[in-house]
């Protein structure tokens, strides 16, 4: 993979999201400005790390980063805006929540939200840019914990296992029990379960 060349600036924030594909829950984003004086070993795309490693890195990122922030868009916002626009909104919220304003923002993927500072989308950024890797870890650990909490309230759906993604088990339980208030009503399988599909 081509090595990423950083912009000529000091304070760079990385931004990533987790949860665009699930049928339930918020899309969660994170923004992270790392401290060059306190490097963190082993940063990588959160999906390539074990849960144990993600949890350990999450704590290290929170402790060592110059600034970090979480953003989110709730299911009703996803339904109103669509998943792409809701994700952009959640990214804007994460950047706005940083207590140090970044000079430049690097976003995982191929689209940038409108921000008050220069920004660039980086394809496969979660594997190429440590700031984005750190953001991906914070977002995933946060969203996974939310799904585990939701699983306690609604154990019949298996949220702790599939994290809300449309697995065969989730679709079966959706058909059997209907949708919760946390499901995204604009998503096809949920629409069908509610009898709203045309």
Swiss-Prot record:
<feature type="domain" description="RNase H type-2">
    <location>
        <begin position="10"/>
        <end position="198"/>
    </location>
</feature>
<keyword id="KW-0464">Manganese</keyword>
<dbReference type="GO" id="GO:0006298">
    <property type="term" value="P:mismatch repair"/>
</dbReference>
<dbReference type="InterPro" id="IPR012337">
    <property type="entry name" value="RNaseH-like_sf"/>
</dbReference>
<dbReference type="InterPro" id="IPR024567">
    <property type="entry name" value="RNase_HII/HIII_dom"/>
</dbReference>
<dbReference type="GO" id="GO:0043137">
    <property type="term" value="P:DNA replication, removal of RNA primer"/>
</dbReference>
<dbReference type="InterPro" id="IPR022898">
    <property type="entry name" value="RNase_HII"/>
</dbReference>
<feature type="binding site">
    <location>
        <position position="108"/>
    </location>
    <ligand>
        <name>a divalent metal cation</name>
    </ligand>
</feature>
<feature type="binding site">
    <location>
        <position position="16"/>
    </location>
    <ligand>
        <name>a divalent metal cation</name>
    </ligand>
</feature>
<dbReference type="GO" id="GO:0030145">
    <property type="term" value="F:manganese ion binding"/>
</dbReference>
<protein>
    <recommendedName>
        <fullName>Ribonuclease HII</fullName>
        <ecNumber>3.1.26.4</ecNumber>
    </recommendedName>
</protein>
<feature type="binding site">
    <location>
        <position position="17"/>
    </location>
    <ligand>
        <name>a divalent metal cation</name>
    </ligand>
</feature>
<keyword id="KW-0255">Endonuclease</keyword>
<dbReference type="InterPro" id="IPR001352">
    <property type="entry name" value="RNase_HII/HIII"/>
</dbReference>
<dbReference type="GO" id="GO:0004523">
    <property type="term" value="F:RNA-DNA hybrid ribonuclease activity"/>
</dbReference>
<dbReference type="GO" id="GO:0003723">
    <property type="term" value="F:RNA binding"/>
</dbReference>
<keyword id="KW-0378">Hydrolase</keyword>
<keyword id="KW-0963">Cytoplasm</keyword>
<keyword id="KW-0540">Nuclease</keyword>
<dbReference type="InterPro" id="IPR036397">
    <property type="entry name" value="RNaseH_sf"/>
</dbReference>
<comment type="similarity">
    <text>Belongs to the RNase HII family.</text>
</comment>
<dbReference type="Pfam" id="PF01351">
    <property type="entry name" value="RNase_HII"/>
</dbReference>
<dbReference type="GO" id="GO:0005737">
    <property type="term" value="C:cytoplasm"/>
</dbReference>
<dbReference type="GO" id="GO:0032299">
    <property type="term" value="C:ribonuclease H2 complex"/>
</dbReference>
<comment type="function">
    <text>Endonuclease that specifically degrades the RNA of RNA-DNA hybrids.</text>
</comment>
<keyword id="KW-0479">Metal-binding</keyword>
């Amino acid at each position: 993979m081509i090595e990423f060349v950083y912009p000529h600036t000091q304070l760079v924030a990385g931004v990533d999201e987790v949860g665009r594909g699930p049928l339930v829950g918020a899309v969660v984003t994170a923004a992270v400005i790392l401290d060059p004086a306190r490097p963190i070993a082993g940063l990588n795309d959160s999906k390539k790390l074990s849960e144990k490693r993600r949890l350990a890195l999450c704590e290290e990122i929170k402790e060592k980063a110059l600034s970090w922030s979480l953003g989110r868009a709730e299911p009703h916002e996803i339904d109103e805006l669509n998943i792409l626009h809701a994700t952009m909104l959640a990214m804007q919220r994460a950047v706005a929540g940083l207590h140090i304003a970044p000079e430049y923002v690097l976003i995982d993927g191929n689209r940038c939200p409108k921000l008050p500072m220069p920004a660039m989308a980086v394809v496969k950024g979660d594997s190429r840019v440590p700031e984005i890797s750190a953001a991906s870890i914070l977002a995933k650990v946060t969203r996974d914990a939310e799904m585990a909490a939701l699983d306690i309230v609604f154990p019949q759906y298996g949220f702790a296992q599939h994290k809300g993604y449309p697995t065969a088990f989730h679709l079966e339980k959706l058909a059997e029990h209907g949708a919760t208030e946390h499901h995204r009503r604009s998503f096809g399988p949920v629409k069908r379960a509610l009898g709203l599909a045309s």
